[in-house]
Amino acid sequence: MVEATALSKYRPETISSGTFTDVPPEKLPCVVDTLTEDFIRERNPTDLHDLLRYVPGIETGGKSLLVRQPGTFSVRGMGGTEPMFDGMMPLGRGAGLFMDSFLLDRVEIVKGPIAGLNGGSGAVQNASGGGGSVNLYMKGAHLEDDETIIQGNTSIGRHTQRHRGMFDVNEVFLDGKAAFRFVGTSDYCEPTYINQGAQKGARPRESFTLAPSFVFEPDDDIRFGVKTMFQYTDQPSYIGVPVWKGRPAGGFGWYDSSCRRGDRSVYESFMVNPWLDWQVTEDWLLKFGSSILVSSWSQTTREPYTGKGAELEHFFATGEWSSGNRYMLSDFSESKSLNRNYNLYLRSVYDTKFFEDIGNVLVIQPDYSYREATGGFGTPTSRYGVLLQDSVSWGWFSVLGGVRYDHFESEAYTSGKNRIRHASADAVSPRGGISVQPLDWLVFFGNVSQTRTPMLGLRTVNGLPPQTDPWEATQMEGGVRFKTAEKLWLSLSAYRIAQENVPQVDNTGLVESYEGRSTSRGFEASLSGEITEDWTFLGMYAFNRYTDRDEPPGSKARDFERYPRHAFSLNTSYRFSSGILEDVVIGGGYRFRSMSYACMRGTFQNKNLRFDPSHVVDVNISIPFSKFGGSDEWVLTLGIRNLFGEKYFESSRHYYECLAGEPRTFEIGIRAKW
């Protein structure tokens, strides 16, 4: 909800994940969508998965641990993007499903292949990250002032309720040279599917997160600190239901579940992130960062039934299984994994001027990462990388060029009956961009970027040797930005991403070739900022056309709506500045997604397996307690989510595992800040 004492900010002053330097968003040569702390607070999402659904062009792909890569996202039609802390440190498998968004200062989504900056994702067992990166910036201790925030929200709808409590305390000490911050959340939720059907009576979702952090600044040139996070979630498993002609099929209703009462998904993790910033000279900054993230998860999940052969054709035609079956168990219905991620980087940023009017920013960064996951979810792999990037600005023009080299070492690994051999590989990922600002209100920009990542740890069909040559995703993009008001910018861009050498898998998940090809073309628009000093706005539109070039021309499977062709979101808030409603803030949001098809491993199945267009409207109002004779430090928030009760599918794994969006819910909350 919206805090009435200050208007929400939807547009950041600077962005760092696009270049590893702080740059105003209008001057970037690439597209970066940002979700600010104010935006996150208003949406009050359960986790990162729920938050990213507000960004057109991002597909969340199913909220379940019963997948090979849980917690990854599709950007611009390309799958497998794993979220990262500070643009460099991956969260690890599953974390994207459970990361509480209240911990985040902001989220920056860089559109397009970005391995030329932060490296490829090797050994994640998929053609991952070709469409962009999702970068999380956690709240951390700061030296500005003492601050305490307490917030509680309750949401109630038909067959569902949710209660959240949050606190955020920052204390400055040692004469302003040190600070400690403690952020925490707790969440209790009864989703619709545990109050009816096969899962009726299951225990609700219980989750909590604690995130202490510390910062110390002994002098003006050195600042160091540490961020930590401890997470625990125990929730009823949910994998969705089959879809047929836009509605639930196979004997299921909108808010049914195939899971049993005792099916659970449990996630635990801790993260330690020490860091140091050293301003060596006026022009030279050194940044050191590292992280250790260890997580474990386990799940038991009964899936919706799916048939084969004639029975499958019968389902395509009728939406029902001729056998009458509704449920099934598989080798993946019960699994667990221990995940370890270690990351280390040293970033040198040299920012200077030549001849008084030529600016130059040189970034050099060596880094190292190691990751492993038990249970067959990831081979132990080390990545050694180095980045070289230079940016030159003169008058109207800013030119950026960079290249990154990565060396991968994948250890020998045994999972069940599968033996993965040791492998090593190399990849070079370049990028370049330009922005031209002939007028204060007009910016032209463009970029060419390439991600090259080896595919390590894949299981192949008999006789096919493992592949270590990298797949490639190459983007060409151009656009223009207009300042339509003092703090309101309109951005328009068009892009084309071509992906080559992608592993192709059979129905069992084994690689049968390395010759996959696809193309993603699109157009995006965004309008963000302040229309007036009392009216803020964020609107985003994405058009995407995906082509599977392995399929013959003219076939439906070659050019189909794997993702919605059109997606749009609008969010706004307005603060009354006079009259009886002075300091009251009203807000609203609207999300639209056009039709798309339900797939199996990303491939077209049948025209009847589709998702219909959806329209979701949210409204909210924030009223300071001073309106009732109380303190203006306290704010009452009221809201309705999914105002018109739209029934829709918000994401899917396969055509028989589609997850329904939340029904209409009414929310009340209290927030205090002092």
Where on the chain are the PLM-derived regions?
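Periplasmic plug
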Residues: 27, 34-35, 54, 65, ...
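Transmembrane beta-barrel wall of Gram-negative outer-membrane proteins
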Residues: 149, 156-238, 263-281, 285
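Conserved C-terminal beta-signal and adjacent last beta-strands/turns
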Residues: 170, 335, 359-362, 446, ...
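Membrane-embedded beta-barrel scaffold of Gram-negative outer-membrane proteins
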Residues: 277-279, 283-291, 295-303, 443-447, ...
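Gram-negative outer-membrane beta-barrel transporters
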Residues: 496-498, 514-601
